[in-house]
């Protein structure tokens, strides 16, 4: 609950002014999927290409955020919810500043993704399901996390002993089991360009 003595200060530069200057709309491009599905790889590759084309874009990555803003959170259901809530609020600040925010978070719970959607205007949140089956993610295991989870070294690991709730109606599906990184990156870049005109 917000203290009644805390007053909201309106920004001197409006979101519309940022959009006009940037020549594109701002929005949250929310990549969700299992660990190892390719979220961070695709997010960073797409951001690099969009940036090269003049877009104001940033990436919020799950691992990176847990080194600072969310370093006090663990991986219980409650901490995961708080992790996503905080990221949603940060992403909203970027949207207000005219930036396209590409996020790369497992974000396993539908309810939490829905709450982030409600933070911004209807056309400013785009759920992107980075789809990849568990077996393929385990085979990739770029950080060795699945192996540790299977050995009981990491509790509450999504896909192993903690659930992942697949999006029911995402705006975009990137199937990294069927398409390579370049194809998925190109698909995401085109989607972002189409949605932020």
UniProtKB/Swiss-Prot annotation:
CDD domains found in the cross-reference section: APSK
BP term (GO), one: hydrogen sulfide biosynthetic process
Binding site for ATP: 33-40
Positions of transmembrane segments: none
Keywords: ATP-binding, Kinase, Nucleotide-binding, Phosphoprotein, Transferase
Known catalytic reactions: adenosine 5'-phosphosulfate + ATP = 3'-phosphoadenylyl sulfate + ADP + H(+)
Coiled coil: none
Disulfide linkage: none
InterPro entries: APS_kinase, P-loop_NTPase
Involved pathway(s): Sulfur metabolism; hydrogen sulfide biosynthesis; sulfite from sulfate: step 2/3
E.C. number(s) listed in UniProt: 2.7.1.25
Residues annotated as catalytic: 107 (phosphoserine intermediate)
Function of the protein: Catalyzes the synthesis of activated sulfate.
PANTHER family xref list: BIFUNCTIONAL 3'-PHOSPHOADENOSINE 5'-PHOSPHOSULFATE SYNTHASE, PAPS SYNTHETASE, ISOFORM D
Protein name listed in UniProt: Adenylyl-sulfate kinase
Organism for this UniProt entry: Bacillus licheniformis (strain ATCC 14580 / DSM 13 / JCM 2505 / CCUG 7422 / NBRC 12200 / NCIMB 9375 / NCTC 10341 / NRRL NRS-1264 / Gibson 46)
